[in-house]
Amino acid sequence: MRTLLPVAALACLTAGPCAAAELPVFDAHIHYSHDAWPNLPPADAIAILRKAGIRRALVSSSGDDGTQRLFDAAPELILPSLRPYRTRDDTGVWVRDPAIIAYLEDRLARYRYVAIGEFHVYGADADLPVMRRTVELARQHKLLLHAHSDVDAIERLFRQDPAARILWAHSGFERPDEVRAMLRKHRNLWCDLAFRTEHGSGGKVAPEWRAAFAEFPDRFMVGTDTFTPERWHYIVEHANWSRAWLADLPPALAERIAWRNGEALFAGADRGR
């Protein structure tokens, strides 16, 4: 029986706010998909995450075997999320393919997860039967939904399950004022900042994003998004870039966005296989 282990104690917890260079990182957006496997064995992938100072990573893969391989290699580091994609070819069609439900149900019966996603769904497609069943599975298994979606789709998901917990991938690629409006409306909505740079260009936090972070200090987290194999070689650089702009925030707020929010969101994830 394998176990999702609680995160190791961090030295800076008792030493006060961490210096920017020492900030651990919770990466909320990692993929280890089939096209990465041939040239990046699990041990090498884990070594990259550790070199970057990542203490935990939310990982989903196309297909899920990639996530399971990383979890087997480092269960104390990897938080498994079930992506509804068997290969990348499912990205644009999964929500109309009933076979995806059987895939999800099979994986959920065999393994433990903390989330379903990252998945792509937009607008009215969020009300299609496959998406509705996915929301039901998340509710049944008490899993977070990691949604790469527009505002319309997020609203539809919450109408289906007002108690759903949703991590909004890329903060929807929305403007910070729109992100703030959504966070005010939905208390169970969190945002990752993956594949965005405008919030911390040049090591300085943009004023409109600073206001968003200050209003919702417990709702944002960083992420790399290794959506292609090449992105794995950017993980260390991205972690250091994140530390640079986080250093422009008050230390307590920087710690929250860097890792505390992720740890809090998945605090109950120490469940057995």
Language-model features: where?
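Bacterial N-terminal signal peptides
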Residues: 4-16
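Mid-to-C-terminal alpha-helical segments outside catalytic/metal-binding sites
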Residues: 2-3, 23-26, 43-60, 65, ...
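Generic enzyme active-site microenvironment
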Residues: 25, 116, 168, 222-223
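Acidic/histidine-rich helix-loop elements
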Residues: 30-42, 89-96, 200
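Active-site gating/metal-coordination segments in enzymes
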Residues: 65-144, 190, 195-198
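Catalytic pocket-lining loop regions of alpha/beta-barrel enzymes
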Residues: 82, 95, 125-222
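Active-site metal-binding loops of divalent metal-dependent hydrolases
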Residues: 30, 119, 171, 224-226
